[in-house]
Structure formats: structure tokens, C-alpha cells
Swiss-Prot record:
Subcellular location: Cytoplasm, Cytoskeleton
Keyword check for ATP-binding: yes
Further comment found in the protein's record: There are at least 5 different actin genes in tomato.
Domain of life per record: Eukaryota
Catalytic activity: ATP + H2O = ADP + phosphate + H(+)
Family: Belongs to the actin family.
Protein name in UniProt: Actin-51
Family matches, as Gene3D superfamilies: 3.30.420.40, Actin, Chain A, domain 4
GO biological process, one term: cell division
Length: 336
């Protein structure tokens, strides 16, 4: 969250609401019945964490309202009734969802004006393009969204319910098989951090497994909050490999490369060349080192041999949806 015209968000915190697992015994400790975002994160040891957004779509409106309240009053410290608001939504977000979002903004927060933009379109704006295909992969959902001259092509948008949270869960499972205990919502956050710091995408998965077997060159250490040190090797690239091979976690779905290709193939034959040449990665789950090269390699193998493939991975892509929103909302034509 932040202000239009800024080049980076003022506030970045997880969309979680935490509630105490136990009732407080110490009177006057000022315990709250709910914590949001970073505060929920830091007190996670005593809380049960809930995620009001599932697969990119709001599923718990009471908790979502708490998060918005926290955003306006504690993070941005603004009066919502004084500022027009730009919200973003997942592609193919149900209409009822958008209506509920609008209702809460106008009725609960009394905002003067609001607009809801599709996330992937904003990422494309942020990359300085109006035509291309965006692979947007966050925590709960991934989408491939072809965009032509600024318009998303809804018939060709594909959704993949596979994203960051699944990769974290997969890493938890691998570590549990190795004898480490990671089960609670709080411990999931530790594993998420491990994933973000150490995981990478192999250019050639089979070959990387050979390398991991024969040498310790890819091993890295990670220190847990209690001082215990874990060494991870093949898990580093095994964790995000799921994006390309969902069958690894028992999912019957095409990987992100194939989904991108399928999405392009649903578009008019005349615009495919423009899409192949402008494949833009967006979202936190595209931050793995090596992902752009691998994506390029996989799509080159699927596409016609004469086709020029270009995969763009902007360094700020973790926040490119927000940055695109900042650009859009600061245009005078948009404000009218």
C-alpha cells in the first residue's frame, strides 16, 4: 500500500490476521483480540494465523476489512474519506467479489472515489508496455494474462492454483521428511523465509540433480530462530521446480511455461508474435534466480522454431502491480 506517484509502496506487510490461541491471564496487558500483518507475524508464536485472501480472491470479508482498516489508519495514517482509492483484483475475479469490495470501501470507509484494476495489466504498465503476456505469480494463485494495446483478453486468461504458498508447503514437507518439524502456521513463515533466501530454479532439472549428488557446491546453511542450523542442497531447486512440474506435488495441471504457451495459443494468430516477444514476469513467486532463463528455454521448446522469444523479468517485479497502479493513478486523464 502507498501513494500514487511514489515509486515504491510505503507499507508492505502480509495479508494475515492473527488471533490468540490462549486467553490472556495477565490483566491490563492490553492484549488485542486480533493482530494484523507484521504484528501478527512477530507474535505468531502465540497466534493462529488466518489468510483472508485465498487463491487471489477474498474469502473472509470481516478479516479483509480489518486489514484495510490497519492499512489506512496504522500503516498509511490517512483518513480514507479524503483519498480516492485504487484497488487491484485477480484476473477473473467474480463480479460479486468486486461489488462487495466496492461496497466496503464506500460504506465502511467512505472513500470519495475508487477504481478496481486487474493486477496483471498494472504489471505490464509498470514494464513500459501496452502489449504482452504477463505471468503473475504471487502467494495464492498464478495467472497468465495476454494483453493487447492495454486490454486484457479474458478468453485467453488462464489461472493456475499453484503459487508461493504451495512452494512453501512443499518445502515444509521435504524438510519434515528429513526429520525437521515444521507444522504450525508460525513455522510455515520460517520456511517461507528459507525459500525466499535460498531457493533457485535450475536450467536443467535432471542435470542439477546430478550436480547435487556428486558435489556439495550447491549446499547452503540456514539458521533457525532457535540457533539450530539446517543445511539444504537439492531442496533449493527442488522447491520451485514444482512451478514447472506441478505433478511433483500431485497436481494435475500444466506448469507455468505450458500455461503461458496455452494462453498465447488461445489468442488470435496475428498477435502471437507480439506476445512471444513480450513475456513479462510479475509477482513474488517469479523472484527465484534462474526463472527467466528456464522460462525462455521451455517456451522456446514449445513455440514455432522461427519465433523470437523474450522473457522480461524486471528487478522490481515483486511490487510491479503496485508500481503500475501508482503510475495509472497519477495520470491526470485517469483521475477524471
Amino acid at each position: 500500500a502507498g501513494f500514487a506517484g511514489d515509486d515504491a509502496p510505503r507499507a508492505v506487510f502480509p495479508s494475515i490476521v492473527g488471533r490468540p490461541r490462549h486467553t490472556g491471564v495477565m490483566v491490563g496487558m492490553g492484549q488485542k483480540d486480533a493482530y494484523d500483518g507484521d504484528e501478527a507475524q512477530s507474535k505468531r508464536g502465540i497466534l493462529t494465523l488466518k489468510y483472508p485472501i485465498e487463491h487471489g480472491i477474498v474469502s473472509n470479508w470481516d478479516d479483509m476489512e480489518k486489514i484495510w482498516h490497519h492499512t489506512f489508519y496504522n500503516e498509511l495514517r490517512v483518513a480514507p474519506e479524503e483519498h480516492p482509492v485504487l484497488l487491484t483484483e485477480a484476473p477473473l475475479n467474480p463480479k460479486a467479489n468486486r461489488e462487495k469490495m466496492t461496497q466496503i470501501m464506500f460504506e465502511t470507509f467512505n472513500v470519495p472515489a475508487m477504481y478496481v484494476a486487474i493486477q496483471a495489466v498494472l504489471s505490464l504498465y509498470a514494464s513500459g508496455r501496452t502489449t504482452g503476456i504477463v505471468l503473475d505469480s504471487g502467494d495464492g494463485v498464478s495467472h497468465t494474462v495476454p494483453i493487447y494495446e492495454g486490454y486484457a483478453l479474458p478468453h485467453a486468461i488462464l489461472r493456475l492454483d499453484l503459487a508461493g504458498r504451495d512452494l512453501t508447503d512443499n518445502l515444509m514437507k521435504i524438510l519434515t521428511e528429513r526429520g525437521y518439524m515444521f507444522t504450525t502456521t508460525a513455522e510455515r513463515e520460517i520456511v517461507r523465509d528459507m525459500k525466499e533466501k535460498l531457493a533457485y530454479v535450475a536450467l536443467d532439472y535432471e542435470q542439477e540433480i546430478e550436480t547435487a549428488r556428486s558435489s556439495s557446491s550447491i549446499e547452503k546453511n540456514y539458521e533457525l530462530p532457535d540457533g539450530q542450523v539446517i543445511t539444504i542442497g537439492a531442496e533449493r531447486f527442488g522447491c520451485p521446480e514444482v512451478l514447472f512440474q506441478p505433478s511433483m506435488i500431485g497436481m494435475e495441471a500444466a506448469g507455468i511455461h505450458e500455461t503461458t504457451y496455452n494462453s498465447i495459443m488461445k489468442c488470435d494468430v496475428d498477435i502471437r508474435k507480439d506476445l512471444y516477444g513480450n513475456i513479462v514476469l510479475s509477482g513474488g513467486s517469479t523472484m527465484f534466480p534462474g526463472i527467466a532463463d528456464r522460462m525462455s528455454k521451455e517456451i522456446t521448446a514449445l513455440a514455432p522454431s522461427s519465433m523470437k522469444i523474450k522473457v522480461v523479468a524486471p528487478p522490481e517485479r515483486k511490487y510491479s502491480v503496485w508500481i503500475g497502479g501508482s503510475i495509472l493513478a497519477s495520470l491526470s486523464t485517469f483521475q477524471q
